[in-house]
């Protein structure tokens, strides 16, 4: 709260233009780490798959980012994530979504360490807890908008995520005044920065 109250001396992010991100080129060694991985790392049973928790959260709420981050395998009906905490040889990968290598693992795919949306979620939590004054609902909604708009710029697959699509999604995940609603959407927005989402889970217990 002290940093927020002294923004003249401790400025905070004010737009996606302030995001702390790594930009890469298509020539080694200046490439995204995942760009050096074969496509099989994203599509096989021994590769990396999204967990059912985040896939279910996004699917049930109509989150437009789901098609930016994940891909449905051929023949799949709907979105399905993998079960967490089991060995790959014990898992059934039938119909499980793949990570979208074109957006996450291209040689030139950017990697964001901290984004504007995270700052807004932090502000929303601080307001909800009574640490600072402000409009928690506005911070929450603007955080979601900032996250989606960031990923729209990253997307190379041509998904048509209009402002109307974003506003319809916001109507599906309204802020209800609780910390849980803030952290649940922050958890989704922190996809691909998993250590931050894990830190929030350890201190808040959300998402359940």
Regions found by a protein language model. Give the residues of each.
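Elongated scaffold/linker segments in the mid-to-C-terminal portions of large proteins
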Residues: 15-132, 138, 142-149, 153, ...
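C-terminal functional modules
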Residues: 148, 152, 159-208
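Short, small-residue-biased leader/transition segments that mark boundaries at the very start
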Residues: 3-4
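Residue-level signature of catalytic and energy-coupling elements of molecular machines
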Residues: 7
């Amino acid at each position: 709260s002290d940093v927020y109250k002294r923004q003249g001396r401790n400025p905070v992010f004010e737009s996606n233009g302030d995001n702390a991100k790594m930009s890469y080129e298509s020539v080694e060694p200046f490439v995204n780490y995942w760009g050096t991985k074969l496509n099989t790392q994203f599509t096989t049973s021994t590769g990396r798959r999204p967990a059912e928790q985040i896939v279910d959260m996004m699917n049930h709420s109509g989150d437009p980012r789901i098609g930016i981050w994940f891909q449905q395998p051929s023949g799949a009906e709907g979105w399905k994530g993998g079960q967490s905490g089991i060995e790959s040889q014990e898992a059934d990968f039938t119909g499980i979504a793949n990570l979208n290598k074109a957006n996450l693992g291209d040689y030139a795919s950017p990697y964001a360490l901290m984004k504007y949306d995270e700052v807004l979620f932090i502000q929303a939590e601080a307001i909800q807890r009574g640490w600072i004054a402000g409009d928690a609902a506005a911070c929450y909604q603007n955080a979601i908008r900032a996250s989606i708009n960031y990923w729209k710029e990253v997307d190379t697959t041509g998904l048509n995520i209009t402002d109307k699509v974003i506003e319809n999604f916001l109507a599906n995940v309204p802020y209800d005044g609780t910390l849980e609603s803030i952290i649940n959407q922050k958890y989704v927005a922190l996809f691909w920065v998993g250590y931050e989402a894990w830190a929030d889970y350890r201190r808040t217990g959300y998402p359940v």
